[in-house]
Regions:
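Iron-sulfur cluster-binding electron-transfer modules in prokaryotic oxidoreductases
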Residues: 1-183
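Ribonuclease/tRNase effector modules and their secretory precursors
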Residues: 150-269
Length: 269
């Protein structure tokens, strides 16, 4: 940042703004929504007839951020309904879904039910939580850029971020970008929808599963039961990941993947 001349950060995420203001207050920031509100002839590509605005918890004490979003919504023809309570957690925060799924579900349902109107949000996590609850919901940027009413998997979001970085590096700096290469990248996973959704709920991405299988294969670790189902583990910091899988000619079929906040060490006798 200093080498680049201490530029202003343009932020679309209230959490990013909150963390930067706390930890690196010397960085000047401006919300993307304020800048967009100054652009002429904005295109409305995916509007609702009416909507309620849901403020993320990180914007609870950020009057400027909330106001920028409301002014931009008005540019799109909205006078969004205000919810009776603002700035409450949608359920995503604190890894609640992994630590206490029942509490997460209860909170997400309660927040989704605060209004019968569709929600207009400006937090990617809020968007995902409400779409998974079947609540009509759009990020305010979708009104400008077009919408896709689905929740993407972790590995899809990671791949998209790499594509965005590659495009920006080429367009803004005329430099190539080569994503990091891992020894397990060539592993092919076969994952049923239900298993993939269970992995998502536990914040386990495909790369972690690939690494776990690769380490077990290279180190000769893991277990195999009488039915040919393999069990392998991967230790990272305070987390231990477990993967059950079978080998097929087409790739590794994942039976299940789970994790816990526990490490274990092998002790030589």
């Amino acid at each position: 940042w200093s080498v680049m001349g201490r530029p202003v950060f343009v932020l679309a995420c209230a959490t990013c703004e909150l963390m930067l203001s706390r930890l690196v207050p010397e960085i000047q920031t401006v919300s993307l929504y304020r800048l967009l509100g100054q652009v002429e002839n904005l295109t409305n590509r995916a509007s609702f007839p009416a909507a309620a605005i849901f403020d993320p918890c990180a914007a609870r004490d950020n009057d400027g951020f909330r106001e920028d979003v409301r002014k931009l919504a008005q540019r799109f023809g909205y006078t969004p309904q205000e919810l009776p309570e603002q700035g409450h957690c949608c359920g995503w925060g604190g890894h609640m879904r992994t630590a206490n799924p029942a509490l997460y579900q209860s909170l997400a349902e309660r927040q989704a039910g605060k209004s019968d109107l569709p929600y207009l949000v400006y937090c990617a996590n809020c968007r995902e939580v409400f779409l998974e609850q079947g609540k009509e919901c759009r990020h305010i940027l979708e009104i400008l850029l077009g919408t896709c009413d689905r929740v993407y998997y972790l590995h899809e979001k990671h791949e998209n971020r790499l594509r965005v970085k590659e495009a920006f590096m080429k367009e803004l700096q005329n430099q190539p970008f080569t994503p990091p290469v891992h020894l397990w990248d060539g592993i092919t996973l076969l994952i049923d929808r239900q298993v993939q959704q269970e992995m998502e709920a536990n914040l386990i991405d495909n790369d972690t599963v690939k690494e776990c299988i690769w380490c077990a294969r290279e180190q000769g670790s893991g277990f195999v039961d009488q039915n040919g189902v393999n069990l392998a583990c991967l230790k990272r910091s305070v987390m231990t990941y477990w993967v059950e899988y079978t080998e097929t000619p087409e790739g590794y079929r994942i039976q299940s993947a789970y994790c816990h906040r526990m490490r274990f060490e092998e002790v030589q006798a």
